[in-house]
């Protein structure tokens, strides 16, 4: 039997970057060499959000996923994982692309933290105005 082909894809969100390796298998998901439940601290809603592209297509138990995530916090990393999985599944089976695109999983979320400006407390917060 020929070895299962592996597909790599990269996803990004805020300052997080996720690299996903996807191949046919039994549905095993590892993130940074840990099980996804351990890595995302067994938070069900966050785990479901991360694998939504696969659950949308009902292929969650048909592929093994190996993810490497760096940068940012939990929300950014989950968004990056979701983006990487959506890109990877579309590379494996191009017929999935319209459904994934319709849900907006292929779109890179451009929102980033606005930088702090000098003369202000934060990005937009200035000093309090005093009339007298």
Swiss-Prot record:
It comes from the Bacteria. The keyword Ribonucleoprotein applies. GO terms for cellular component: cytosolic small ribosomal subunit. Pfam families: Ribosomal_S9. GO terms for biological process: translation. Keywords: Ribonucleoprotein, Ribosomal protein. GO terms for molecular function: RNA binding; structural constituent of ribosome. Belongs to the universal ribosomal protein uS9 family. PANTHER family: RIBOSOMAL PROTEIN S9, SMALL RIBOSOMAL SUBUNIT PROTEIN US9M. This is Small ribosomal subunit protein uS9. The gene is rpsI.
